[in-house]
A protein has these predicted regions:
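N-terminal nucleotide-handling cores and adjacent loading/scaffold lobes of large enzymes
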Residues: 41-44, 51
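Aromatic/hydrophobic beta-strand junction motif of beta-rich domains
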Residues: 81-85
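Catalytic cores of glycan-processing enzymes that make or break glycosidic bonds
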Residues: 50-76, 80, 127-130, 161-766
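Aromatic-rich carbohydrate-binding modules that target alpha-glucans
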Residues: 1-4, 10-33, 87-135, 143-166, ...
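Catalytic "initiation/cleavage/transfer" segments centered on a nucleophilic residue
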Residues: 36
Length: 766
């Protein structure tokens, strides 16, 4: 096919890139015209408004774009016309027609057919010897197959191309602006469902990749176009039901073994085992809910037997060898991590007798068949190969059915996962990621995940994220960025906290003492930054148990104030103390010489949590001389104790800090990270932009053409009871509820008054 040049332009100053073109669809030049020299008239290509049309979700799934190699031409002198036309729909092709004989003299049946040589970009070579004069007038026309009666001409004046003086053997390339064809609004429907919930008769107690193909059939049958699933990454830490949370993965690459379709694998040679597993499969499928632990044990046992039976043959195939070569970077550490996790009975690598961190020197022995190390990890290679093969097959099947498979990228990873074990420099392990309080969680959310060391990640161009996105593109054509706000700032909670109230945004512009006093609030560090505990607070929180709490958990600080005893001065210490007391086994517990119920113990524990978080300001995690207003402190006792004038001063400070002070800063932080990531693949990018959303978030999503998430039952405008779909932006995902909210059917039965109001005002039914 000859040489192909793929390139882009950038503006450099002092060795630093100040600006560069859109990288997802770079310029492309095939040297197929047989010339001895090429002269190219390019134009700068910024991120287009309709960039979603270039995504694999649209071009490869919906439109079934078929790229072709341009035909080889042998003209003495050649003019190449190159233009982008992402608006074309399935079955359409592009032609160029004009006043010159070589362009058909405005007759469609003589128009020059063009070749789609890159995504959304078409080209045609023109023989200069058939041109007269130094100008060409032309237009581009979209044609339905070979039916010229269904031609759509671009609007506007004729395009004019002025030819330069050309020598024999020269090829002149004109890169023209996008075709002027109408952009039909693209609206598609879809379904969101976890793979694990897709149980069918062929399942083994849990939904698998075989069931995913059945779901793809249903989506296509109902004329939907998108099937979104929850994360499918491996989350195995303890081999118990606590591993079932899909947003705490141990590897951003590895797939969870529960999703393997056993029915698509060779049968077990052991007849007795085969019959036993078939009976177990039937039993697990009949359960009303997934028995996570039994399913895991059964599938792992089955795969171990199949590996012993068939593993050596499979791992000798070219397909496996290619898989291993393409994924070796992450696969080898992952397999060793899994082996060590199972050997030591814990995913907490800090407690392992050895191998506290991945050692690159181990790679060779772990990758060489016949070594002892290889024998310990080969099973995990084998399982991941099966999973990757089946998921790749499901992805190809979805494309055949014109269905977009949409994945989900969790914002965090497990603190005790392989990613942290392998590359700890990318993570901050002295804090916990979470979310501020909202309508669903008054104490905020503490996910327990480590936060990212963004400075370290940016040092190598966010390659950790780029590799993550590129791996995901093997299986999906669209993805949801879970908690996209984390790329602006993350809610970082101290490691000693259970709830999220003592968190702070990181990064953020914390306040100095002088800045706080600038709002009119006299700075009192001891009063504002330590738990506000008085007798009236204790009476309000604990009622008749106030004296008991004073005697056992507190000590006097002054005549008026108390402080927590050292043994209980953090929420984690309180949690550990009460852990045995609140074990829900129906037994009463001895509690400082008195019996107590589980409920009473939980109430005391939660009250102590509340005391510890009752502060007006939180000290910055990195600079002890700077402070953050504590989130939602207006509902707490320390705020209640302020004079009315001080409350007004504090409220002004609070609103400025959370809603104005950091906006431009957070915008800059997001723009340092997200552009690199959204350009890493051609997947369609969708954001989950819910929660405490600063005003800079829409700026970034719009600038990068990222789809927002609009939940009709939880509108972003607080003045609306329900979201109005006609007001949602075109670049958005519209849904009635998200994966962590009740489904439409469940919501319909929760509150009949609200349901009736929705029925009347949104559906316009009497």
């Amino acid at each position: 096919m000859g040489t192909v040049l793929s390139y882009y332009y950038s503006v450099e100053r002092g060795g630093t890139t100040e600006r560069q073109e859109w990288l997802v669809v770079p310029h492309r030049l095939e040297l197929t015209a047989g010339g001895t020299s090429y002269r190219v008239y390019d134009h700068w290509s910024d991120l287009p408004e309709d960039s979603f049309l270039y995504s694999s979700a649209v071009s490869d799934c919906l439109m079934e774009a078929r790229l072709s190699v341009p035909p080889v031409t042998r003209f003495v002198r050649t003019v190449r016309i190159r233009v982008r036309a992402p608006q074309l729909r399935k079955g359409q092709r592009l032609c160029v027609v004009g006043q010159q004989p070589a362009l058909g003299q405005w007759k469609m049946e003589r128009a020059v057919p063009m070749t789609e040589h890159a995504v959304g970009e078409w080209m045609a070579d023109i023989d200069v010897s058939r041109l007269y004069g130094s100008q060409m007038e032309l237009k581009f026309v979209a044609v339905e197959g070979n039916d010229f009666s269904k031609s759509l001409w671009e609007s506007g004046d004729n395009r004019t191309v002025t030819l330069p003086l050309m020598s024999d053997g020269e090829v002149v390339v004109y890169d023209l602006t996008e075709v002027f064809l109408p952009l039909a609004p693209l609206r598609v429907a879809g379904t969101l469902v976890p793979v694990f919930s897709l149980r069918s008769k062929s399942s083994f107690g849990v939904g698998d990749f075989g069931d995913l193909k059945k779901m793809i059939d249903w989506v296509a049958l109902t004329r939907q176009c998108v099937l979104q699933v929850l994360p499918i990454n491996d989350t195995t830490q303890t081999h118990t039901w606590t591993d079932s949370y899909p947003y705490s993965c141990i590897s951003i690459f590895a797939i969870h073994p529960q999703y393997v379709d056993l029915s698509a694998l060779p049968p077990l040679a052991d007849k007795k085992a085969r019959i036993a597993y078939e009976q177990l499969r039937s039993e697990l499928n009949d359960l009303p809910q997934i028995d996570y632990e039994r399913v895991q044990e059964a599938k792992t046992g089955y795969l171990r037997m199949l590996f012993a039976q068939d593993g050596e043959r499979v791992m000798a195939t070219k397909a496996y060898q290619q898989f291993f070569q393409e994924n070796e970077r992450w696969l080898v550490p992952y397999a060793q991590y899994c082996s060590l996790r199972d050997r030591y009975g814990s995913a907490d690598f800090s407690t392992w007798p050895a191998h506290h961190q991945w050692d690159e020197h181990d790679r060779k022995s772990l990758s060489t068949p016949g070594t002892k190390a290889y024998g310990e990890v080969a099973f995990f290679y084998y399982v991941q190969y099966l999973l990757f093969s089946q998921m790749s097959e499901a992805h190809a099947y979805a494309r055949q059915k014109n269905v977009i498979l949409k994945g989900d990228i969790p914002i965090g990873v497990s603190r005790y996962g392989c990613d942290v074990w392998m590359e700890p420099r990318y993570f901050n392990l002295n804090g916990q990621a979470g979310a501020p309080p909202d309508d669903f969680s008054v104490n905020g959310q503490n996910w327990g995940l480590p936060t990212y060391n963004w400075e370290e990640m940016l040092r190598d161009g966010c390659q950790w994220w780029v590799r993550r996105f590129q791996s995901m593109a093997s299986f999906f054509d669209a993805y949801r960025i879970d908690h996209v706000l984390g790329f602006f700032r993350i809610w970082e909670i101290p490691i000693h906290s259970v709830h999220g109230l003592l968190g702070q945004f990181q990064p953020a512009l914390a306040l100095t003492r002088e800045e706080i006093e600038g709002y009119g609030l006299h700075w009192q560090e001891e009063l504002f930054t330590t738990p506000f505990i008085t007798d009236w607070v204790l009476d309000r929180v604990f009622h008749e148990k106030a004296a008991f709490v004073r005697d056992h958990f507190l000590e006097r600080k002054t005549d008026y104030y108390y402080r927590m005893k050292e043994a209980f001065d953090t929420q984690r210490k309180v949690e550990a103390f009460f852990a045995a007391l609140v074990a829900d086994d129906g037994q009463r517990r001895d509690f400082f010489g008195k019996e107590t119920t589980v409920q009473d113990a939980e109430n005391l524990r939660d009250g102590l949590y509340a005391l510890i978080s009752d502060v007006l300001f939180v000290r910055d995690h990195r600079d002890p001389n700077r402070f953050h207003p504590r989130i939602c402190v207006q509902l707490d006792f320390v705020y209640e104790s302020l004079y009315d004038s001080d409350k007004a001063f504090f409220n002004r400070l609070y609103d400025d800090y959370f809603y104005r002070r950091n906006n431009q800063y957070w915008y800059g932080e997001a723009m340092r990270k997200l552009p690199r990531l959204v350009e890493a693949t051609r997947m369609l990018v969708c954001a989950e932009d819910l929660g405490m959303v600063p005003s800079c978030v829409p700026w970034v999503l719009d600038a990068l053409r990222i789809l927002s998430l609009e939940v009709q039952s939880m509108p972003k405008d607080p003045a609306d009871e329900f979201g109005h779909t006609d007001r949602f932006p075109h670049r958005s995902v519209c849904t009635f509820s998200s994966h962590d909210m009740p489904t439409l059917r469940q919501w319909w039965d929760e509150d009949w008054d609200r349901t009736q109001h929705y029925y009347q005002t949104m559906l316009h039914r009497a």
